[in-house]
Amino acid sequence: FAELLFPDVTKTPEYYEEKYPYRKLPNKAEVTRLAPSPTGFIHLGNLYSALTDERLAHRNGGKFYLRIEDTDAKRTVEGAVDTVINVLRYFNIEFDEGAGYPDDDERNAYGPYYQTQRVDIYHVYAKSLVERGLAYPCFCTEEELEEVRKQQEEAKELTGYYGKYATCRNLSDEEIEANIKAGKPYVLRLRSQGSPDKEIVFVDEIKGEVKLPENIHDIVLLKKDGIPTYHFAHAIDDHLMRTTVVVRGGEWLASAPIHYELFHVLGFKMPKYAHTAHLMKFDEETGGKRKLSKRKDPELSLDYYRKDGYHPYTMKVYLMTLLNSNFEEWHEKFPDKDINEFPFSLDKMSTSGALFDKDKLHNICKNELSKLSEDELYDFLYDWAEENEPEKKNIWFADKEKMLGILRLYMGIGMKRRRKDFMYAKQIFEMIGYFFDMEDTQEKDEFRMDTEDVKTILNEYLSMYNHEDDNSEWFNKLKAIADKHGYASDMKAYKANPEAFKGNVSDIAEVIRIAVTGKANTPDLWSIVHVMGEAQMRDKIQKVLA
């Protein structure tokens, strides 16, 4: 009855084996893939997996491709594929082939890469299984299946369609033909060869040797509309696209017996599997670890990092520390080497769950951004502002030399040691916003002196200010203001007898600093004023005095 089920299928598995030959790749090269559902939501776990796949493939000249598992129409979101490609491209992860390339492009050689466009292929292999007695149509209704499930639960038996519960498994050819001609809807099921008292054994590339019970379920291969289930499509796609390593989350380990059986009944060589541990975070409420959650953790979404402007390289450095336990030591030893030179290995990946630590991410951001030149950081900030703050961009980047001067100042370029204040674009613009008169939209630090003392100091500062003064001359004038109002100009004298003074010259500088920047802590104040310009500085102080 294979012809009855698939009257329009004329091709054979051999046709596709010839159409998609084994790839000619260097020794030890791997073929990996990212295979998301087009839901429109791409998260940190996807980036974590994509980086794993990309590093595995490219360490020895292999291929990394994008496949879209879009068989669930209810979850498909328009534009989701472009989102996946563009978000990963932002993080400098590019696919060698796959979804997103034109049909006639050589990077589409093993396509199509959308599962909904591969239904004819799945039907060829489904027909072959039917011909060999390894698959059969099941006419059970949802109500009948639900009744079986209830019986199994009451009897405290394994739930599912197997053994004596697989009633359609034993239908005669005549019964099958009569049901089909009567127009009864059906799914196509695998006739499982598994035994409940046997195990499968395979070596997981991360977890090591794994033993699991054989699959005994007659799983659905094709749904009533002819669309394949994930399990069936996965096996055929990974075989024909010549995937050598499947990297996926640990939650898929329980499905390994199903995939193991499918690869064997289809006559395919099974790829290597690497089941990654979940990304975890410390839960302050419970004091323990938990999985990152879409509902609880906004930082799970990659849009979070794009919109706030995390530099893609800093994210990759951080994720590499989670992926391989020996990466940090290597990166400290070779700080100027491209991280793609790191000898990435699956056996250095965590088996218990990598702990996502935002503080550590920010420390890495500070360290990596401090290595950039002011021009590199300028270009990154410009691109981020163009996409995320187009109106403010025209203000921030109206004067390129001014912006470069600000970046040099905050990065400590020209100093003995680079400053490490910057973490991500949004935070950077908040930090330097006062240069563009944006401090009114930000929270300001409070003056620690009373209002009259603040006004007195600011008025005297303006009256004696000369923009031609060098740093030393400028600071001597601050000392003079300090002496006049009972503040120590000599720090040694202040430390020796602090009770003799109202404070010291740094308190005078703080008043001016807060008036000019809105912040008590900034880089060198004299340098700030000279990047800003005298007119803007005076205007800011006059606003405070008013």
Residue ranges and their predicted role:
Residues 29-33, 65, 298-299, 338-346, ...:
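Short amphipathic alpha-helical segments and their helix-coil junctions
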Residues 479, 483-546:
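Charged substrate- and nucleic-acid-binding regions of tRNA-handling and nucleotidyl-transfer enzymes
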